[in-house]
Amino acid sequence: MSLPGLDLTQPSAEREFAPAPPSQITLSAGSEWRFEVAFGTTVRVKLISGTAELFGTELAPSQTYTFCGTKSAIYTWHGCELEVGAGDAISALEATGMNGAATAQGFGAGGCQSEYTAEETPMVEYANVHFALETMRQEAKATGKDGPRVLILGPEDAGKTSLSKILTAYATKIGRQPIVVNLDPAEGMLSVPGTLTATAFRTMMDIEEGWGSSPMSGPSAVPVKLPLVYFYPMQNPLEGDGSVYRSIVSRLALSVMGRMAEDEDSRETGIIVDTPGVLSQSKAGSLEMINHIVTEFSITTILVIGSERLYSTMMKNYDNKPTSSASAVASDERISVVKLSKSGGCVDRDAAFMKHVRESQIRTYFFGNPIPSTASAALSVSASSTTNVTLSPHAQQLDFNSLGLYNYNITSTEEDEDEYDPAQFGASDAFLPGGANDAEQGASQQDENPSATPLPGIVSSIESAVPSGASNVPLKKLLPPAPSALANSLLAITHVPPTATPSEIRDSSIMGFLYVADVDSEKGKIRVLAPVGGRVPPRAIVWGKRWPGEVVGLVG
């Protein structure tokens, strides 16, 4: 009982968690609204009047867009008015899959964790870069040369991917078809983490999903993209002296250049290459890796964001130097280095947030997008108020002995040395003298007896079954029993047969991914989720043990 005139009663659950009414946000010309939304909650944004864009892609008037787990900014060139409100909460299944992600709504408009209006933005600089690239494209069309090949460099969380989206969106808006290359294995572009991808963009990008979506069996309001995917199951490009990453980059560049030679629109538009921030940290081998990328993609323009030191180094090494293009001598094609300002909206994304991003990308690959989207519903034939793309992966049990499963055997100081897996120890293992490991013992035995051959039916690693010229590829074939560490990890299916050489497996593009739900080491069976039905094709499979690593909670 409360005193008269004082409302001291306990608030009900409905009253406590009732969503706040939508807020009206007015932006003046040349300003942007920056917002952060936690995983597990959604925020709806509607353009009431004026014009606005998110990373270069225009918002449709009177359409409601739903955002979840993002840090973004909506910019306006001429002024606009936005309506921001709280969206529907994600179901308990998706929320538990976030593994402890922050799901509490913030105190900003619509439940944003953080939101504010900024008057100072680098959008004018970015627009000038777009116009300069467009001038180069017009010259390429007139002279028959290749279009600009742009490399974006900068430290972590400097806005490199955001700039890539802006330049791509502006190019597609005027009918161009740029090829976008993602060289950052930490985040997937139209794919899962741990991949290097290249995609030709002819149509608009998705406001809610960033780059958009790749082909799937469900409906899509925005035209899907067709990515070329290579698997690099490590977080750092410089792992193992960078030899694996360097080889995959070369193969990806060869495919991109082949596409440009056959596609006139892509050749005139050029390419945009997004890079990982670790290459800008002055670590051993980083400058050599940048030089490898510049050479392989015949880069003509280097954009440096948020690093004076890196900009100075790039100016000394590349500015006004001839490109590696075959036509550079005849056309006097030279490299330009440009410094760009870092946006004040760039915020640090901690390890916990990036883990949620990776888990969300993997979950979306197998189960679709759980976020209800009214924008997609408005473009669909049905009259439902909200819609979400729900996919149903196919579960099946595989015989481990029938799989050609490989793993990259690269030592790392960051790897957990205390990891213990009893399934890895079999009858052939022994306690080696002096603390030597299997690799050291095997190497010493080969030195003593180079002509020694393994026993029939026993292959210790893939290197012993291939010519010596390919033995430098650190791929090792997994032998029975099935390691229990396979559970809750990804498997990448390549396009080459299981008997392919290590270099062929490393350089092969990816057909699709499997998720290992359970491992039965005693019976030699593994239970997997596949995006399509039918038998798993007899192809070489690469284990993503180290990256993206273990993904717990994807299935019950």
From Swiss-Prot:
One of its GO terms (biological process) is tRNA splicing, via endonucleolytic cleavage and ligation. It is found in: Nucleus. Residues 1-21, 414-458 are annotated as: Disordered. ATP binds at E32, K71, D157, A158, G159, K160, T161, S162. One of its GO terms (molecular function) is ATP binding. Gene3D superfamilies: Clp1, DNA binding domain (2.60.120.1030), P-loop containing nucleotide triphosphate hydrolases (3.40.50.300), Pre-mRNA cleavage complex subunit Clp1, C-terminal domain (2.40.30.330). Its main location: nucleus. The keyword Translocase does not apply. Belongs to the Clp1 family. Clp1 subfamily. Component of a pre-mRNA cleavage factor complex. Interacts directly with PCF11. Required for endonucleolytic cleavage during polyadenylation-dependent pre-mRNA 3'-end formation. This is mRNA cleavage and polyadenylation factor clp1. It comes from Aspergillus terreus (strain NIH 2624 / FGSC A1156). The gene is clp1.
